[in-house]
Amino acid sequence: MDEELRSLTERLRRESGGAAPYEHLASTGDLDELAEVLTAPGHPLWARELAAFRLGLAGDRRAFESLVLFLNHRDPPRCASAAYALVRLDDPRTARAAAALATNELRVAYALHPVRLLADLHAPESVPALITTLERRLRPHDPYRRVALACVQGLGELGDPRARPVLNDALAHPALAEAAVHALGRIPRQR
């Protein structure tokens, strides 16, 4: 069992109080039953998250909408689990959804995991969305330095020359300068 799955199962076991329904959802192999949890009324949040996560890991695209909602949740562990499952779901809609969440100024406080997801996806939408998000975070006194740092790191990981101007701008910000130097070092030199 990998670390993200272990963390999720422990957290949701605590939320559920270790009830029998939790054990059943954690062990069932019936994907239709898990999908039903996402659409039927009356299921607690922990059950919906567990069902969406398990469907995502199984590559069942019925989990997509629920996972995107969890990616935009105010609780960071839910966001992290959703991002993990979305990478494994391999749905072509994921990058567009992550880009929309990362660039939404009204939800910037919750953009950290969508930004990290964009870097993990290496999708065509990733670099433009990370550039846009980072440009907005370079304003004076912006309170979202963790989002800005994740953008810098993601752009370095992606190594796209289009990121060079915004990464050069990030050098002027002490909290980002070291990461920007590393990111710029990962971008191939133009000839």
Located regions from the model:
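Amphipathic alpha-helical scaffolding segments comprising HEAT/armadillo-like alpha-solenoid repeats
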Residues: 2-7, 26-40, 60-72, 91-104, ...
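Non-membrane alpha-helical segments in proteins
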Residues: 19-20, 45-57, 80-85
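Boundary/linker segments of alpha-helical solenoid repeat arrays
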Residues: 109-111, 138-144, 175-184
